[in-house]
């Protein structure tokens, strides 16, 4: 039976350390990190995520602000607000909650955020730095997974890693971070031929395909480490991952649960990157 990776417990531990670091810097400088979250419309899931981010920022000792904009906000109005925060030195991190309403171009919005304040790590400049081996802002979910590997002493060098899912938010940056640790990485997706066969070769399997219970024990080698990034709802409204947890846990060596695995770490890494952006602003 697999050991369960306690993402919630690890996130709380790192959050406590972050609050201590913030308090020390405040004592030295009289300043704290500032994080603004911008949300457009009333998507219920977005509202939950935003509340969690706000709660986490306040727990870390940050100054936190949420800009709640109506659904009909124009793209120009949103870009203008982002530029206001770009120019304000009191705010070190800017998060725009996705998804945005259909009339707003996500890419234009992500491009508008100052790369130095892009704590989501989605700006093309930050993506380029990651791929060139000089990361500054890293997408928070892959960053959280790497922190899990470190905390649990999971060796990556020389290991075969398979990532299922090729999004810019998780799959691609995850593959690059694993490569940087000298893993041999295969990046797969829903159209990969013989996907289960490919996945079954993995020592490290990261699943971010967005399909509930997509990965069964037929995808998993005995003793593999399995990271489930999925967040889906079943027919009863229960939150489930991309991995069929009960059967995969019988053969994996370590596995993340859903909920309580990757999710809490994602928010903690957003806070860590806000802190780092604040530190860089003090040094510049």
Curated annotation (Swiss-Prot):
GO terms (BP aspect): L-histidine biosynthetic process; methionine biosynthetic process; purine nucleotide biosynthetic process; tetrahydrofolate interconversion
GO cellular component: cytosol
Its EC number(s): 1.5.1.5, 3.5.4.9
Keywords from the named record: Amino-acid biosynthesis, Histidine biosynthesis, Hydrolase, Methionine biosynthesis, Multifunctional enzyme, NADP, One-carbon metabolism, Oxidoreductase, Purine biosynthesis
GO molecular function: methenyltetrahydrofolate cyclohydrolase activity; methylenetetrahydrofolate dehydrogenase (NADP+) activity
Pathway terms, separated by semicolons: One-carbon metabolism; tetrahydrofolate interconversion
Residues binding NADP(+): 165-167, 190
Reactions accelerated catalytically: (6R)-5,10-methylene-5,6,7,8-tetrahydrofolate + NADP(+) = (6R)-5,10-methenyltetrahydrofolate + NADPH; (6R)-5,10-methenyltetrahydrofolate + H2O = (6R)-10-formyltetrahydrofolate + H(+)
Listed CDD domains: NAD_bind_m-THF_DH_Cyclohyd
One Pfam family here: THF_DHG_CYH_C
NCBIfam families (alphabetical): PRK10792.1 (NF008058), PRK14179.1 (NF010776), PRK14186.1 (NF010783)
Function: Catalyzes the oxidation of 5,10-methylenetetrahydrofolate to 5,10-methenyltetrahydrofolate and then the hydrolysis of 5,10-methenyltetrahydrofolate to 10-formyltetrahydrofolate.
Matching PANTHER family: C-1-TETRAHYDROFOLATE SYNTHASE, CYTOPLASMIC, C-1-TETRAHYDROFOLATE SYNTHASE, CYTOPLASMIC-RELATED
Subunit-level organization: Homodimer.
Protein family according to the UniProt entry: Belongs to the tetrahydrofolate dehydrogenase/cyclohydrolase family.
Protein name: Bifunctional protein FolD
Biological source species: Streptococcus sanguinis (strain SK36)
Gene transcribed to yield this protein: folD
